[in-house]
Amino acid sequence: MLAVDLVRRGAARFAGRIAVHVEDRSLTYAEVDEAANRLAHVLAGLGVSRGDRVGLLLGNGLWSVSVDFACLKAGVVRVPLNGRLSAAEHTRMLRDTGVTLLVYGPELAGRAVELGESMDGLRLACLGESPHADHLDLMAAMRTASAADPMLPAAPDDVILILYTSGTTGTLKAAQHTQASYAAITANILSNLVSPGRDDVMLHAASLIHASGTFVLPYWVRGGAAVVLGGFDPDEYLDAVSRYGVTALNLVPTMLGMLFADGRAERADLGRLSTVVYGASPMPRPLIERALDAWGPRFVQYFGQTEAPLCLTVLDKDDHAEGGALLGAAGHPAVDARLVLTDEGGAPVAPGEIGEVRVKAPFTMAGYYNEPELTARSLGPDGWVRTRDLARFDDRGYLHLVDRSSDMIITGGYNVYPREVEDALASHPAVAQCAVVGAPDPTWVEAVTAFVTLRTGAQASEAALRDHVRARLAGYKVPKTVHFVDTIPYSPVGKILRRALRDPLWEGER
């Protein structure tokens, strides 16, 4: 099955149903599909052909889904750019992937012009009226383009998407996904996370050209709808749940924390809401317990990564209802994924021991773009992908993530995983956010070091927090130093950027 075939099947079956809601406007399946056809012809008229890379610098909007589908139908490779990244990062992404056409939204015209000026040969096209008259208005061009499906040939191994990792290690990597793997992502979501029907509606506030967009096709092929917000505002988000009859949410822990920050989430009208899917970063135990108390067992957690989206493991609603230790688990393996834990040499570890998670599944990447050596280190010839995540299985078969192998701290010969220390710190009532890294130490080589932000109006001393951790973990895991800071740095997808805290501590040491 190809991803483009899923688009065509959904359009044919549900032509008259509403597919997308944006504010007070909506589009039917037929309208989304026709716009995709027209945009595909516009792209072809710009000289973009099968296999060419097209950069996307877009916020969420009425035509976001049509743009994605247009790229599929035109046979081009989407290279989405996160608007929160720097111009230098955007430039590197575009250059490394050989992008010659950048499609941007009017609100990001300034960045688009900056990129155009820094890159010879980069053409710019605006999804709407641009403040720059010499840039093509794709919406105007779309109105006069053919509405017929271009019906270009497509093959399972055709690369259709290049997704850059969030760069928590400081290295941007371009994971490639194909027609077949993207269709498999849709099947993975339907098999493990949601099972929508024609009356189901998912709310999107994160960027559709990134991970959130993977939930569009599962609802599309079942006749459901997407409510698309321009960004995440807690009040607007909760209002949309009742306004549009939303049945499912897709969010990251940071978003859930913002929803519950002022108590409004407890008072919100949830209407038809039945499922809250979350993932992308660890969920603080106090937060999920509070959310469960308020909203009940509507929650489903997934663990995955850019190289193997979306769901390697799942912690389902029944698991959340059981609660207890299970709330700290990543879940049980997805029905369409094979997982194994290995040592540094690649051999399986004994039951209960910590090992690196490796996965084999139809939805894994086809390798990193133009990086054969990096691909060889991460993707074996037998199809197994190294995740670089350390984990263990419990006696019930649930996977428990320990940490990233690159984040592990070795202090006095003992291994310390930052996440377990962060979990202990986060259980203190005064702690809002925290991050743990290793700092250079003449005696221990690395010293466990914590960065903490306190809740508004709360107080806690360094000694109190160290005592709190000591009551829960071994002595060598207790932070030697606690730094109180205003903010903790996060990546665009909500992962702690430990390197931003760690690297300054090691200047001159390595």
Tell me what each language-model feature is:
Residues 221, 246-251, 260-325, 338, ...:
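Gly/Ser/Thr-rich phosphate-binding loop
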